[in-house]
């Protein structure tokens, strides 16, 4: 089994008589006054119909309090207790979902979380009187979720627009070192949140703040007494107080893979535990510790397992090139096992995977690794933290920072290929954009692990050629040829596969382009390859006025102003990958017509994105031509650069309205 932080750290049993005194410091003044006691919901809170600081809010956190204490229980073992109290106001229909609660929690043989005191009350006004509806305990459901995890679900009763929902519960966790990240920001506004964290001086934690909204902080200490072996020891409890008022909803913006990493919050990471004369444990880790953790786990054992398909692999050895052999192995694994569309970190026993004919991406990667080693390739796991779970900081080691792993395959000639066998939409060096991170780690024994950048494994782009003619009857009849490569091919395949059939795909294409498709063909959209193409013949009617024909030079825009509607932005812009677009438009001018007007030539750059756009339009008596190119090398735009990026994007999007005018002679 893969060793995790909560399996390595064992509770330490010490005799103790401990008195804990609760206190809280009210630091911030919120816009809406609230009585913080559970059940003390005011008529004013129920009469509230909108939130002045954000009239678009569908719901509002009126008050939230989190109290966390690391302490010793009656048996002398360290535990962590967290008490949560939340009060939410429903302002619009879309906010009704805030009455549904889901808690995924840890439960294994060694360590576990346990919940108690779950109390959920809904408050409504009826004839000017406050009516309370309590949730019966029978509506609390506790079920298996995944390995070592369970899920609690429950829902407030009689929730409607105008309701106030109040919930409280306690959680005791034997993983005392694992303090939950505290977020003062959500995707709805927060009127007031208060938090208290109580930690005995024996513990040392690193604290890291995140986000852009200010959070008030204060600290103090209290004394307590530890009884051990007949001796008494007076020690301090360090108490952190946090308070945040009028916290705006975190606005979801395009081109963000993980919103939570930008929420205003605080994260606690344990460094050490020291009880003088009794115990010292250092919980800080290096990347070498992280490597060792994985190398000594079932992850690496199953990665090194023998080939499961020896006969088929022997036949693959006859392929002409190393690339063809690798490609054949991936196809073999994908024929034998269907991807269950999950990204995992720990492979299942490979025999079970083959028998089930279904598995995670790492199950399939382990099967491919065995075949590739059988063919003489050097194969190594590359540890990846998916972009959807946040950015990995390689200067700040964590024991289990990764979400999954892919394969690094080295050929006899020294060529290096990265691959993931889960998705059939990828290829060698063409991965799901979620995996395109700058800090992936090649896992090697004996201290040989290294960091690698996966953001530029292949050249990605789209080439488009549109050749058409204008029928004097009033229609443009043309053929659009599209060639995708690299990551663009991956996304094109993913898009194509999302439709039930080709007819549904055509119907959507006609709606998007505003055309009538006459003929369609494609290659590579269902293949394991790094390219794909489409050929579409269609007709459409341009706008006309008297003897003028207005020809839009773009069938469909490549970029949109809607991407960056906000005037400012507090989180980075995270593009999927570097890419380019090449588009050539050719229109044959019919006899009796002439080009009256063409757009001006354009060249715009954006230093922040290392991006450039050019458009050149040419015309003679017989042909109208436009050539458009776009290139972008940077994939990350900083908030400080957002104004320039947005301005560039606006000018870029304006290009797609470019019109040429034909005149009947």
Segments from the language model and where they lie:
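Bacterial Sec-dependent N-terminal signal peptides
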Residues: 1-33
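Beta-strand-rich, non-transmembrane domain signature
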Residues: 30-292, 348, 363-369, 373, ...
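Generic detection of long, well-ordered alpha-helical segments
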Residues: 76-77, 303, 319-326, 499, ...
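Secondary-structure boundary elements
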Residues: 287-356
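Short glycine-aromatic motifs
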Residues: 336-339, 435-440, 592-595
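A carboxyl-terminal module marker
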Residues: 506-665
């Amino acid at each position: 089994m893969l060793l995790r932080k909560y399996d390595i750290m064992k509770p330490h049993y010490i005799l103790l008589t401990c008195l804990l005194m609760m206190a809280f410091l009210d630091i911030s003044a919120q816009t809406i006054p609230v009585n913080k006691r559970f059940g003390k919901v005011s008529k004013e809170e129920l009469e509230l119909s909108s939130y002045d600081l954000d009239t678009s809010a569908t719901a509002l956190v009126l008050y939230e309090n989190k109290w966390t204490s690391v302490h010793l229980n009656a048996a002398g073992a360290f535990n962590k207790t967290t008490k949560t109290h939340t009060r939410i106001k429903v302002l619009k229909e879309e906010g009704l979902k805030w009455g549904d609660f889901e808690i995924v929690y840890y439960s294994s043989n060694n360590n576990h979380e346990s919940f108690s005191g779950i109390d959920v009350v809904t408050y409504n006004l009826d004839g000017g009187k406050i009516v309370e509806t309590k949730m019966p305990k029978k509506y609390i459901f506790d079920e298996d979720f995944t390995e070592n995890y369970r899920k609690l679900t429950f829902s407030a009763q009689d929730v409607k627009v105008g309701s106030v929902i109040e919930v409280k519960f306690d959680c005791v966790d034997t993983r005392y070192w694992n303090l939950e990240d505290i977020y003062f920001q959500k995707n709805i506004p927060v009127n007031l949140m208060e938090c208290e964290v109580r930690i005995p001086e024996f513990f040392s934690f690193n604290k890291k703040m995140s986000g852009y909204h200010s959070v008030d902080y204060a600290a103090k200490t209290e004394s307590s007494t530890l009884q051990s072996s007949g001796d008494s020891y007076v020690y301090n409890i360090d108490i952190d107080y946090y308070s945040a008022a009028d916290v705006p909803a975190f606005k979801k913006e395009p081109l963000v893979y993980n919103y939570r990493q930008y929420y205003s919050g605080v994260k606690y990471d344990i460094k050490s535990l020291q009880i003088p004369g009794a115990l010292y444990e250092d919980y800080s880790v290096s990347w070498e510790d992280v490597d060792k953790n994985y190398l000594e786990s079932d992850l690496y054992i199953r990665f090194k397992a023998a080939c499961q398909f020896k006969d088929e692999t022997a036949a693959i050895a006859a392929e002409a090139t190393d690339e063809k052999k690798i490609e054949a192995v991936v196809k073999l694994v994908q024929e034998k096992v269907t991807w269950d569309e999950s990204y995992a970190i720990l492979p299942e026993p490979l025999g079970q995977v083959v028998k089930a004919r279904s598995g995670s991406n790492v199950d399939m990667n382990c099967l491919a690794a065995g075949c590739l080693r059988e063919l003489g390739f050097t194969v190594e796991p590359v540890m990846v933290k998916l972009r959807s779970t946040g950015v990995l900081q390689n200067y700040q080691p964590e024991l289990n920072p990764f979400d999954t792993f892919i394969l690094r395959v080295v050929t006899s000639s020294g060529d290096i290929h990265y691959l993931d066998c889960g998705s059939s939409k990828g290829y060698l060096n063409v991965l799901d954009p979620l995996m395109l991170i700058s800090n992936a780690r090649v896992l090697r024994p004996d201290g040989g692990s290294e960091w690698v950048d996966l953001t530029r494994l292949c050249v990605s782009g789209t080439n488009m050629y549109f050749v058409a003619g204008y029928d004097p009857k009033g229609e443009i009849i043309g053929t659009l040829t599209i060639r995708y490569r690299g990551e663009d091919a991956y996304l094109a395949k993913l898009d194509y596969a999302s439709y039930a059939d080709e007819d549904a795909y055509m119907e959507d294409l006609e709606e998007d382009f505003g055309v009538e498709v006459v003929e369609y063909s494609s290659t590579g959209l269902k293949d394991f390859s790094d390219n794909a193409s489409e050929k579409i013949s269609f007709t459409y009617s341009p706008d006309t006025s008297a003897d003028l024909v207005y020809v839009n030079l773009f069938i469909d825009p490549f970029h949109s102003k809607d991407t960056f509607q906000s005037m400012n932005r507090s989180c980075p812009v995270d593009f999927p990958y570097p890419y380019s677009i090449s588009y050539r438009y050719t229109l044959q001018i019919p006899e009796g017509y002439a080009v009256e007007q063409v757009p001006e030539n354009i060249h715009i750059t954006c230093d922040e994105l290392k991006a450039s756009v050019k458009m050149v339009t040419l015309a003679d008596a017989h042909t109208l031509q436009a050539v458009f190119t776009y290139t972008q090398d940077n994939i990350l735009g900083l908030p400080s650069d957002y104004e320039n990026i947005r301005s560039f994007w606006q000018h870029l999007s304006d290009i797609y309205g470019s019109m040429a005018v034909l005149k009947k002679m």
